[in-house]
Design a protein with these regions (language model features):
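Conserved helicase ATPase core of P-loop NTP-dependent helicases/translocases
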Residues: 18, 34-42, 61, 210-214, ...
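Post-DEXD/H (motif II) to motif III coupling segment of the RecA-like Helicase ATP-binding lobe
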Residues: 79-142
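Conserved interdomain linker/interface between the two RecA-like ATPase lobes of SF2 helicase motors
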Residues: 123-200
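Conserved helix-turn-beta segment of the N-terminal RecA-like "Helicase ATP-binding" lobe
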Residues: 7, 14-38
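Long, largely alpha-helical accessory region at the distal end of helicase-like NTP-driven motors
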Residues: 179, 189, 312-404
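Conserved helix/coil segment N-terminal to the catalytic DExD/H
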Residues: 38-72, 83-88
């Protein structure tokens, strides 16, 4: 407030920087606080700077600054900080306070971002705690049988082959249309009034997103498709149409995963498998923001017969704070320990798929040995632990904290 302390705020998207500077201006009751350095915004001063990591690197900003210039550096979405693009920032500057913000501190590649903070978190609150404290809205999660089986889809590097997923989700045969029709039926079945739905549907590819939008529009449900390459004005216009109710759903790929708030979103559809809990939680978080006209978030999670290496249980564990062994009992008992006011319901066939998957993964010795053999065959050498975690998308916490 006294204007003496110098601040550098770093994020990787303009959509994060703009609300961040607005929030601090409001909190400090100073409408002129800070300057943006991102895209077409060029800052004239550096005392209180809100800069994208891309601008930081392209301008070689560190070369212009004393390492001790900033009193505080805030890095949003800090789970990105282990990436190469953040190393100049973190190694050059020596602020009095380094503050990292993230909803997903566990990286799937096993790299530990806590090393920048003496190995511990200063403060931590998880999604379950946020919901129970009413900092995020309640959710009703419906796990729906997916008519498409993924058991024969190619699996490499800890995930399904994107091209094969796209083909099965958008193919010219009857199966793709059957799946799209089942998605609409589920939306109608599990939402109170389609006229009130403001939804995001997360897709596997651009082609998949456009296929879904086209199908919905043909059925009289207004929809748009967006991806990371969509122009900013197109994205903004789509967001406004969703908020105003002019459209019902936006199908997206590689967009709205993180850092972008659309509080009016009241329905999230997971239309593709993801083995990354970081991405899953980020996408789920797009619908958890509080909003005056939103009582709860409806989550439609389409569960297919999966490759046995796919990890269903982690998404439930992230909401319940339980390990895979306990999750099996939670499913069998109807999820009695979800946050107050929330629910998780599995359709009969979906529940069978999930339990079969969990049982397979709980046979850990056999499962892990198969994974090691597969990686050794593909790479020509026995993988290190780091290589194993990165290739399989198994988090170290899961590996060390479960019986196997």
């Amino acid at each position: 407030r006294k204007g003496n302390a110098k601040l550098l705020f770093i994020a990787h998207r303009e959509e994060i920087l703009k609300p961040s500077i607005a929030c601090l201006r409001q909190g400090l009751t100073d409408p002129n606080f800070g300057q943006l350095a991102v895209g077409n915004y060029h800052a004239a001063r550096s005392e209180h700077l809100f800069m994208s990591i891309q601008t930081f690197n392209s301008q070689k900003f560190w070369e212009k600054m004393d390492p001790f210039y900033y009193d505080m550096i805030i890095v949003d979405e800090f789970h990105h900080a282990a990436a190469k693009g953040y190393q100049k920032l973190l190694n050059w500057f020596h602020p009095k306070i380094l503050l990292g913000l993230t909803a997903t501190p566990e990286r799937m590649d096993g790299k530990n971002i806590l090393n920048y903070f003496g190995g511990h978190m200063a403060a931590e609150i998880r999604i379950r705690d946020d919901i129970e404290r009413r900092l995020l809205c309640r959710l009703h999660n419906f796990c729906i049988d997916d008519p498409v089986s993924l058991s024969n889809i190619k699996w490499t590097g800890g995930h399904y082959d994107i091209e094969e997923l796209e083909n099965v989700y958008t193919g010219e045969g009857a199966l793709a249309s059957q799946r799209a029709r089942a998605i609409i039926q589920a939306l109608e079945r599990y939402t109170a009034d389609m006229r009130d739905v403001k939804a995001l549907g997360f897709c596997v590819s651009k082609k998949h997103a456009h296929f879904m939008a086209d199908y919905f529009n043909r059925q009289g449900i207004k929809a748009l498709a967006l991806d990371a390459d969509s122009p900013k004005d197109v994205r903004n216009a789509a967001r406004q149409k969703l908020e105003s109710g002019d459209i019902t759903i936006i199908f997206v790929v590689d967009l709205f995963n993180e850092g972008v708030d659309i509080p009016a979103v009241n329905t999230v559809l997971f239309l593709r498998p993801t083995n990354s809990m970081t991405i899953f939680l980020q996408q789920l978080g797009r619908g958890l923001r509080l909003f005056p006209e939103k009582d709860c978030l409806t989550v439609l999670d389409f569960v297919a017969q999966a490759n046995r290496k796919y990890d269903f249980a982690s998404r439930y564990a992230s909401l319940l704070g339980k390990n895979h062994v306990v999750i099996k009992k939670e499913i069998q008992d109807g999820f009695p320990h979800v946050p107050k006011g929330c629910s998780i319901q599995l359709e009969e066939i979906a529940a069978r798929h999930v339990l079969e998957n969990i049982n397979s993964r709980l046979r850990k010795n056999e499962f892990y040995m198969d994974m090691v053999k597969e990686l050794a065959s593909a790479t020509g050498h026995i993988p290190t632990l780091e290589e194993f975690f990165k290739a399989t998308a198994i988090h170290p916490h899961t590996f060390y904290n479960e019986k196997h």
